[in-house]
Each structure stands twice: as C-alpha cells, then as structure tokens.
Amino acid sequence: MLERCPWKLISSPRNIPARSFLNSRGTYLVLRKSNILPLQHILRFSNFASKQCFPLRNGNNSASKALWNNKSKEKEPLNTSVKLASDVPDDKNVTGQMIVKDMLQYIWPKGKTNLKVRVVSALALLVAAKILNVQVPFYFKSIIDTMNTTLVQEVGALWSTVGAVVLGYGFARIFSTVFQELRNSVFAIVSQSAIRSVSSNVYQHLLNLDMNFHLSKQTGSITRAMDRGTKGISFILSSMVLHIIPITLEIAMVSGILTYKYGPSFSAIAATTVALYALFTVRTTSWRTVFRRQANAADSKASAAAIESLINYEAVKTFNNESYEMSRYEKHLSAYEKANVKVASSLAFLNSGQAIIFSTALTLMMYMGCRGIVTSNLTVGDLVMINQLVFQLSIPLNFLGSVYREMRQAFTDMEQLFSLKRINIQVKEAPDARDLVLKGGSIQFDNVHFSYNPNRPILNGCSFNIPAGAKVAFVGASGCGKSTILRLLFRFYDTDSGKILIDNQRLDQITLNSLRKAIGVVPQDTPLFNDTILYNIGYGNPKASNDEIVEAAKKAKIHDIIESFPEGYQTKVGERGLMISGGEKQRLAVSRLLLKNPEILFFDEATSALDTNTERALLRNINDLIKGSHKTSVFIAHRLRTIKDCDIIFVLEKGRVVEQGSHEQLMAKNSVYTSMWHSQESPFGESNKSGDA
C-alpha cells in the first residue's frame, strides 16, 4: 500500500507592499533618557526582539493598515510574468514584529493544554533557577567574612559555620543547573511542535499557491529559504523563552541587589553599562544585518543555480556547458564568500566593543570596592560579592549580546519563509462552494475571456458546448489557447470574464477538491517522481492497493513491459522519468489516469513526442479504454490524423472557436480545418486544397 499525506486548501491574507519606516529616534528611545532606572532599561530592552529587530512600517500608511486588517477585497486580474514578481512579497516587508506575532501562536497554541502547561512549567523553572543563581555571591561573601572574623575561634566552630554556608553554596549551584536543564527539556516539545507546524503550514500553502507563482519562482531558492527559516524558528523559540526572559530577569535582580546593598554609585555604573552595551549591540547588529541579507541572497542564488543545472543535467552535457555552469555557480559562491567575510569581520568588531564596555565597568567597580575596604565601609567579603555580581551581570549581558545578534540573524533567515506564507492565493473557493455533482460530464464555455498577460489575450470570447460522454478534440495553431482550456477547467487560473460550467454547475461555485477529482489528464510531458513505477502509478489514487495498481497497468498495456524489468514494479524511473522511454512514460500516465478513474478525461498532446508506431499503439490502447466507458474525453492535438474519429472537433483561432463538427463535416466546409489537414498531409507541410479529403 502507498502512503500519502492528504492535501487541503488554506487561505492567506493579502500582502500589500509598503515602504514606510519608523523614525530612527524611536528605535533607541528607551536608552536616551539618562535618568531611567536600570530595571526599566532591562525590561524595555527585551522588546527589541519583537519591535526593533527590523524597521517597522508607519502606522499611518494605508497600505500597511490594509495588510493588518485585510480589508482589501477587490479581485486582482491575472498578471503578466513581469507582474508575477510583484505578487511575491519582498522579504524586507516582513518585519520582526510580524514574525514574533506569528510565532506567539505556536508558543501558546489554542486548544493544546499540554503545550501551555509545558510553557508555564518552563517559566517557573527558569525563575527558580535564576533565584538560586543570584544566591551564589551571597554565599561567597558569607564564607569570606566568616573566615575573616572567626579565625580566633575554635576550628570546630569555624568548620561548623563555614561548612553550612558551603553546603548552601553547593545546593544553590547544583539546583540552579538542574532547574535550567529541566526547563530546556520541558520546553523542547513546544519548540519542536512549533517547527513542525510552521514548516507544515508553509509547505501546504506552497502546494495551494497558483500556477503563476510556481512558474515564476526558482525551486532551489524556495527550498533553501524553507531550510534557513526552520532553523531560525528553532532559535527564535528557544531565545524567547529560554534566553530573553531569564536574561532580563537576571539583569534586573543583579542590578537591584547592587542598588540595595551598595548604593546609587554602583547601580549607576551597572545601569550605564547595560545601556551602553545594549545601544552598541543594537546599532552594530543593525549595521551587520545588511551583510547577512547579502549572504542569504547569494546562498539562495547558488542553491538555485546548482539545482537547476542538475535537473537539466542532460542539456548541460549535450551543449558541453559544464564550464559555463561552474562559472555561474562560482560567481554566486564568490558573492556568498565576500558577504560572509563581512559578517565575520563585523562580528569581531562587535565582540571587541562589548568587551571594552564590560571591562571598563568591571575595573571601575573593583576600584570603588577596594577604596571601600580601605575606608572600612566595605569588607573583603563585599569586594568578593561585588566581583561575583559583576561577573554574574556579564553572563546575561554576553548572552544578551549574542542572543540579540543571533536573533537578528534568525529573523533575517526567517524573512523569506514568512513572506511565502503571506503570498495571496488568487484561486479560492467561494464561501458557499458545493461539491460537484456529476450527471454525465458535459462542459460549457460561455463567452470566456482570459489572458496571462493583459497585452496578449489568449481566449477572446471563447464559447463551446461538449455533450456528456462525447469524444471531442481541440485543434489550432500554437498559442491559440488549447492547453489554456485545460488549465481553466482545472481552475489553475480564473477567467477574466465569462462562465465555465460542468453539468450546468459553475466552476467558481464548486469546491476545488471535487472539481479536480472529477478530471484526469495525460499531459504531453508526464511528470514523474524519482521513485518506483509502483509509486508513480499509485499516485493516481494513494489509497489503491498493489493489485489495483497492477490491474491499471494491465489495462494500459504496460504490465508486461514492467515485468520484463529486473526489478519489476520496484524499478526506479529516475529524475522526471528520464530512465524510461517516452512511450513507457505515457503508458504510465494512462495507468495513473485509470487508477484515478475520473469522469472527464483530458489528453493534452499525449502522443506528440512519440514515434509513429508507438503513437498508434498508444492511441489504440486509449480508444479501447474510452469505448463503452461513457466518459467525456477531450483531446488536444497538433497531428490531425490522431483525432480524426472524434465526435466533435473544435477549431481554435485567435482565442475563439471558428469551426466545429466531425472530420467529414469540417472537410466539406473547405475552410480552416481543411487547410490544416492538407498542410499536414503534404510532404513539405504546404497547403494542397486540390487533394482528396
């Protein structure tokens, strides 16, 4: 049995690009006022992760409001390939605040009590760990002062006093570490669940995006963006709960102790250190983000170039363009290298600046502590405690700097992933859409207008009727709209105007799942997965048994061919089916179609790439399957002799049906179809109207 994941359609809010940014003064407003208490510095700094990691849009901008309120409901026309790029939101328009807002729903998910309990438990454990952690300097002070003042006492009494303090110190250290590790373990499930949910949602959204998007984007860059984005999610989630909150709490507690125990001079140095450290980190990291974006862009281009050349390996070889492909790849790698050198150099500058700020503060505090001992205002234990508190402050500060830096990098990595989520799905189900009720499979196009490019209409008032159970064909010159009819019937695109009906039911009022389930297609170039023949045939019906798959292959007259392979149905077909012949690929497509068993069959130039003998054999096979099935079958063909026996032949010209009828009726008209027939029958493709039909 084959296993598949069910697909379902999801919707996404429209993303409206906007170019408006928060005033730079607002970015560091929290650090500008010198009289703000240290605790206010610390608590407000934690908001940088969500509000100031990226420039925000101006709240007065109408486009920005439309993005958040999703009030824009007007229907967009189908776009040109040039306009396609504008439909894909620029990743710079996705701000850190948007990403954090999206991520919060995964940290505190609705309807998942077990995950919420884990979040609360993790927060409780981190508070307990930090409370125990700040006890360590007190124990150090107590040990030093006790030993300094009780040396004249008996050794037993000294050990009794100091031993109790040492045990307390050990208890605080051990359980602080235990609580931290328990917190990490408890929160791991929340983090991994969020990564799975985000990745699944983005992938599902990509599957439901319009054909426009997939025709205009490089697969390599999309997969690379998803890979970087999921790694960024892991870091952001762990940072928000496991780093930002505990770091903020620890800085607040250490600053409060310094203020309470040693007065405003020590607290002023601590506050100034935190402020300067945060300001320097934010400014420098903002500057470094540009280099990270450049590295990501080069990385995506290199990945896309490599995947594209490997997919088209045969073309690379036949045109002897290995050196050209290598030069393309090397060009992107060179850009990636240069950007990463800038990232590394700017990181060295950031680390040096942070070390200078902290070391200066440590030196000042130690000087003040020594002076306090000389004046008998402080004890040696106080000096040790100050030293411990300052180093205790250094740990969260260093973490805060590195976490902020890594969060900015993670946000940059996640920009494109979340921009993919915000791409609008143009083809959507109506809120009151109903399942298609088939009554034979009649198809009607009523004055349909459609264009991929507004300057180049494809269908221009196209109208026709296909009776239920009929065998029909569409013919015409390349670009007249034959394959477009199939795409519109599948609702890969919506019409610009006009109606399409199946059994008198409008397509835009039918659920997409029931519509696409009712139609099967054998395309000109059959898309095959790099998997076994069994898997590829079974893709027509993921629930089919192996016996049903074999039966479909027998009906398509390919079972004996498959059995002749050394591995039979377990034979791998290779990338895009390149390891089997064209005729075998098309027979696999017919097998897949039979397994799906739809009511409407489409053959989109299914034999155009085959040799004459293979084409005739496959057509005989297809005709045998259609006879007696009472299914509506539609053929699109360039070779008119392959559709000569159709009940109705529609001749398309300039996006309209200009002639219709059987082969004999159309030949009797001696018009467009007749000219096409004689042109193909002539040895050199020249029209010969004097010949017999």
Curated annotation (Swiss-Prot):
Binding annotation for ATP: 452, 476-487
Span of the transit peptide along the chain: 1-28
One Pfam family named in its UniProt record: ABC_tran
Phenotypic consequence of gene deletion: Abnormal mitochondrial function; decreases growth on glycerol (non-fermentable carbon source). Abnormal endocytosis and vacuole fusion. Sensitive to copper, and dithiothreitol.
Topological domain spans for side Mitochondrial intermembrane: 141-163, 261, 368-382
Chief localization: mitochondrion
Positions contributing to glutathione binding: 288-292, 351-354, 401
Keyword match rRNA-binding: no
Keywords: ATP-binding, Membrane, Mitochondrion, Mitochondrion inner membrane, Nucleotide-binding, Transit peptide, Translocase, Transmembrane, Transmembrane helix, Transport
Claim: Transmembrane is one of the keywords in the record: yes
Tree of life domain: Eukaryota
Gene3D superfamilies assigned to the protein according to its UniProt record, in alphabetical order: ABC transporter type 1, transmembrane domain, P-loop containing nucleotide triphosphate hydrolases
Cross-referenced InterPro entries: AAA+_ATPase, ABC1_TM_dom, ABC1_TM_sf, ABC_transporter-like_ATP-bd, ABC_transporter-like_CS, P-loop_NTPase, Type_1_exporter
N-terminal signal peptide: none
Residue ranges that the UniProt entry lists as topological domain Mitochondrial matrix: 29-118, 188-236, 283-348, 405-693
Domain ABC transmembrane type-1 stretches: 119-409
EC number(s) from the headed UniProt entry: 7.-.-.-
Chain ranges passing through the membrane: 119-140, 164-187, 237-260, 262-282, 349-367, 383-404
Location within or outside the cell: Mitochondrion inner membrane
Function: Performs an essential function in the generation of cytoplasmic iron-sulfur proteins by mediating the ATP-dependent export of Fe/S cluster precursors synthesized by nfs1 and other mitochondrial proteins. Hydrolyzes ATP. Binds glutathione and may function by transporting a glutathione-conjugated iron-sulfur compound.
Family label: Belongs to the ABC transporter superfamily. ABCB family. Heavy Metal importer (TC 3.A.1.210) subfamily.
Record's subunit section: Homodimer.
PANTHER family documented for this protein: ATP-BINDING CASSETTE SUB-FAMILY B, IRON-SULFUR CLUSTERS TRANSPORTER ABCB7, MITOCHONDRIAL
Protein name stated in the entry: Iron-sulfur clusters transporter atm1, mitochondrial
Species for this entry: Schizosaccharomyces pombe (strain 972 / ATCC 24843) (Fission yeast)
Higher taxonomy: Eukaryota, Fungi, Dikarya, Ascomycota, Taphrinomycotina
